[in-house]
C-alpha cells in the first residue's frame, strides 16, 4: 500500500510537470493503458479528464468502475468486431485507418444514437509495425467521398506516431509532413468545418518537438504514470 500511495503522489507531480510544459491550446491525453485505476484516480484528482486506452476489454473494465465524466480516447489498432463494445461511451477513436473501420464506427454509433469523433491515423514513421494510412491512401480515401455519407462519425483531424529514433531532425520532418497533410485535407474537404482541428502527435519521448510542430493534442503515458504494469 505504501508503494501504491507513493506512486500516486508521483503521478500527480509528474502530471503537473507535463501540464506546465504544454502551451495554451494543446490538450493532454493521459495514456493509462496497463496502469491501475488508482493511478488514473490520482490524475483525475488533479483535474485530468481525458485518458487513452488501446485495448477494448481493459477500457470497458475501467469505464465501468471509474468516474463517468472521464473522456475516453481509444488510441490503439481497433478491430471492427470490437467497435460495438466501446461505441456507447467512447469520446474519440484516434486510430482510424480504413474506410471499413469508419463504416463500422458509423453503424455502431447509429445504434447508440450518437456521433463518434474520430481521427484518421497516418503512417509516416519508418517502423513497419506502425498502422495507419500512407499519405496517398489518405488522399484516396478522402477523394472517394464515401465518408461524406456517414452521419454518425465526425472526422476531427489526423493522428500519427513519429519514428522512435534519436534523430531530432527526422522526428521533426515527420511531424511537419503530418502538418502539411492536415493543411491539405483541411483546405480541400473541411475548410468550413471548425471541428476539423485536431493534430494528435507527440508522446513521452517527443511531445515537446511535436508541440513546436503544430500538435494540438499530445498522448503521454510513461512520463506521467511510470513504467507500465503488464
Question: What does each model-found stretch correspond to?
Answer:
Residues 2, 6-205, 213, 225:
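Conserved alpha/beta-domain cores
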Residues 215-230:
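Gly/Pro- and small hydrophobic-enriched strand-loop and loop-to-helix capping segments
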Amino acid at each position: 500500500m505504501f508503494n501504491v500511495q507513493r506512486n500516486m503522489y508521483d503521478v500527480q507531480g509528474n502530471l503537473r510537470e507535463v501540464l506546465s510544459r504544454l502551451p495554451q491550446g494543446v490538450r493532454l491525453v493521459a495514456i493509462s493503458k496497463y496502469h491501475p485505476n488508482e493511478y488514473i484516480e490520482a490524475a483525475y484528482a488533479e483535474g485530468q479528464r481525458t485518458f487513452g486506452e488501446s485495448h477494448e476489454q481493459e477500457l470497458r473494465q475501467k469505464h465501468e468502475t471509474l468516474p463517468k465524466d472521464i473522456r475516453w480516447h481509444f488510441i490503439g489498432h481497433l478491430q471492427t468486431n470490437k467497435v460495438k463494445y466501446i461505441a456507447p461511451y467512447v469520446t474519440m477513436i484516434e486510430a482510424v485507418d480504413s474506410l471499413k473501420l469508419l463504416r463500422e464506427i458509423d453503424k455502431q454509433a447509429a445504434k447508440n444514437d450518437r456521433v463518434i469523433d474520430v481521427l484518421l491515423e497516418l503512417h509516416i514513421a519508418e517502423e513497419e509495425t506502425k498502422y495507419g494510412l500512407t499519405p496517398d491512401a489518405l488522399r484516396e480515401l478522402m477523394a472517394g467521398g464515401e465518408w461524406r455519407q456517414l452521419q454518425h462519425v465526425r472526422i476531427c483531424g489526423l493522428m500519427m506516431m513519429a519514428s522512435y529514433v534519436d534523430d531530432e531532425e527526422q522526428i521533426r520532418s515527420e511531424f511537419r509532413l503530418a502538418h502539411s497533410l492536415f493543411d491539405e485535407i483541411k483546405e480541400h474537404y473541411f475548410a468550413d468545418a471548425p471541428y476539423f482541428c485536431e493534430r494528435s502527435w507527440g508522446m513521452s519521448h517527443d511531445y515537446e518537438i511535436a508541440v513546436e510542430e503544430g500538435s494540438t493534442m499530445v498522448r503521454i503515458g510513461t512520463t506521467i504514470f511510470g513504467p507500465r504494469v503488464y
